[in-house]
From Swiss-Prot:
Signal peptide bounds: none
Catalytic activity: 3-methyl-2-oxobutanoate + acetyl-CoA + H2O = (2S)-2-isopropylmalate + CoA + H(+)
Residues holding Mn(2+): 15, 203, 205, 239
Domain (Pyruvate carboxyltransferase) ranges: 6-269
Top-rank taxon: Bacteria
Name by which UniProt lists this protein: 2-isopropylmalate synthase
Pathway as given in its UniProt record: Amino-acid biosynthesis; L-leucine biosynthesis; L-leucine from 3-methyl-2-oxobutanoate: step 1/4
Ranges that cross the membrane: none
Name of the gene: leuA
Keywords: Amino-acid biosynthesis, Branched-chain amino acid biosynthesis, Cytoplasm, Leucine biosynthesis, Manganese, Metal-binding, Transferase
Protein family per UniProt: Belongs to the alpha-IPM synthase/homocitrate synthase family. LeuA type 1 subfamily.
Annotated CDD domains: DRE_TIM_IPMS
């Protein structure tokens, strides 16, 4: 290994899972592990085998399937934990036992009820036992960020003597600041005589929002492994986010000179989405690197700059993490340059329309609708569509019966005619979708469906967003109601109306 390679140790399946309301299934964990292997993660911490039979089996299955990443299991500094970790890991091509014990005064006295000498003895015994199973042993000083520095140095020195090849320095409660954490690592390298015999790792939590900053500050002082999770999942406020620290190393080569990882960055976005879907943990829209707004531009000034040179407002190319679609949002803040570019992308010559006229009508629509899509812009050009009330399909009545055979009955007004259909589905939402498809005689494919609470309490409103694909083009719909089925029906109707208007535009083009 070259000195400046940063080992990426992913603990999504262990520390990340601890943040979830319920445990993941074995096959779900395997799916994530295989995605992490494909991403290029060096070490995958697959779980804590002694904690449950389910975790043991998950670690065992992952160990048997993953070939290119080292599989790691966590254990306390107890013989039974270490033995159980080995039993789960022994089928792996490459495996690591990760044992830990708390070293801060607070944890030793109030949690473990032991003094430093007892803790030191337990740590050495655990490392020696783990070494009887493998040369790849990692030792963590839990709550290192609040451990007296002389004690920490002595513990690290003795852990290395006992045979630990990786020493992990966790900021367990996210307490330290970057300069402070960097100084801890610096002191370790200056005071621990055998520090060169082990790789120094860091595991930073995000309680004060410093996890990524602390991790990066540590590698500047000699740390060469970063422990992190996809999307920053983890206890309380989470862990250092893999996507953030990896892209920071890749993007700021001017400052983080010579450092690199083996992560295949083009797989970051799809891995993030996969983990979000499996864990049922939504990604905040403003989340760095992978949030839906991370590469979105709605300000007219920003859009104009990006259209001229993307680097004016983008320090990372979306394609670098595997995003290839356009993230320019058309809102009331968009300027003429954005509208002109969108029309050009749709194939309209600037000599065929009056930009000032189109822009004026666009602003009126954007004020009412919020976000405007390219098909809305085309409708403005051909249909003078400016009002959300100008809909071909309007839901008049809706009823749903749940149970063994979910059934929906939808009554829609199409112009002046009322049409009613009843359909079944795998759930009430699908039943409603099937009704609308039959009434409209349009057969789009549902590509995305999401629900977000827009208020709190028993009368909370939920917003449903859907993406429908029709003839190779995506159409968005939005619905808002205290009833999720009603909100879903509104969202479907909104998207169907967008499809209908696009068909009318095509008719006008052909005329």
């Amino acid at each position: 290994m070259k000195d400046n390679k940063i080992i990426i140790f992913d603990t999504t399946l262990r520390d990340g899972e601890q943040a979830l309301g319920s445990s993941l299934g074995i096959n779900q964990k395997l799916q994530i592990a295989l995605a992490l292997e494909n991403l290029g993660v060096d070490v995958i911490e697959a779980g804590f085998p002694v904690s449950s039979q389910g975790d043991f089996k998950a670690v065992q299955k992952i160990a048997s399937k993953v070939k290119n990443s080292t599989i790691c299991a966590l254990s306390r500094a107890l013989d039974k934990d270490i033995d159980m970790a080995y039993e789960a890991l022994k089928v792996a091509k490459h495996f690591r036992i990760h044992t830990f014990i708390a070293t801060s005064t607070l944890h030793m006295q109030d949690k473990l009820k032991k003094d430093f000498d007892e803790i030191l003895s337990m740590a050495k015994r655990a490392i020696i036992r783990a070494r009887s199973y493998t040369d790849d042993v990692e030792f963590s000083c839990e709550d290192a960020g609040r451990t007296p520095i002389d004690n920490l140095c002595f513990m690290v020195e003795n852990a290395i003597k006992a045979g630990a090849k990786t020493i992990n320095i966790p900021d367990t409660v996210g307490y330290t600041l970057p300069s402070e954490f960097a100084n801890i690592i610096k002191i370790l390298f200056n005071k621990v005589p055998n520090i060169d015999k082990a790789i120094i790792s860091v595991h930073c939590h995000n309680d004060l929002g410093m996890a990524t900053g602390n991790s990066l500050s540590a590698i500047l002082q000699g740390a060469r492994q970063i422990e992190c999770t996809i999307n920053g999942l983890g206890e309380r406020a989470g862990n250092c986010a893999l996507e953030e620290v990896v892209m920071a190393i890749k993007t700021r080569k001017d400052y983080l000179k010579g450092f690199y990882t083996d992560i295949k960055c083009e797989n970051i976005f799809k891995t993030s989405k996969l983990v979000s879907a499996i864990t049922n943990e939504s990604i905040p829209s403003h989340k760095a690197i992978v949030g839906s707004n991370a590469f979105s531009h709605s300000s007219g000034i920003h859009q104009d700059g990006v259209l001229k040179n993307r680097q004016t407002y983008e320090i990372i190319s979306p394609s670098a993490i595997g995003i290839h679609d356009n993230r320019m949002l058309m809102t009331a803040r968009s300027g003429r340059a954005m509208i002109k570019t969108c029309l050009e992308n749709l194939g309209y010559d600037e000599n065929t329309y009056n930009l000032d006229d189109v822009y004026e009508r666009f602003l009126r629509l954007a004020d009412k609708k919020g976000q405007v899509y390219d098909y809305d812009l085309e409708a403005l050009m051909f249909l003078s569509y400016e009002n959300e009330e100008e809909n071909e399909f309007v839901i008049e009545k809706l009823s749903v019966i749940s149970g063994n055979i979910p059934t929906a009955c939808v009554c829609m007004r199409i112009k002046e005619e009322l049409k009613t259909e009843a359909c079944t589905g795998n759930g009430p939402v699908e039943a409603v979708f099937n009704c609308i498809a039959r009434i409209t005689n349009l057969k789009p494919v549902l590509k995305a469906y999401s629900i977000n609470a827009k208020s709190s309490g028993v009368d909370a409103q939920g917003q449903v967003d859907v993406d429908l694909e029709f003839k190779g083009r995506k159409f968005h719909g939005k619905g808002l109601s205290t009833d999720v089925i009603e909100a879903s029906a509104q969202a479907f109707a909104s998207a169907y109306n967008a499809i209908y208007r696009s068909l009318k535009v095509e008719e006008r083009k052909m005329a």
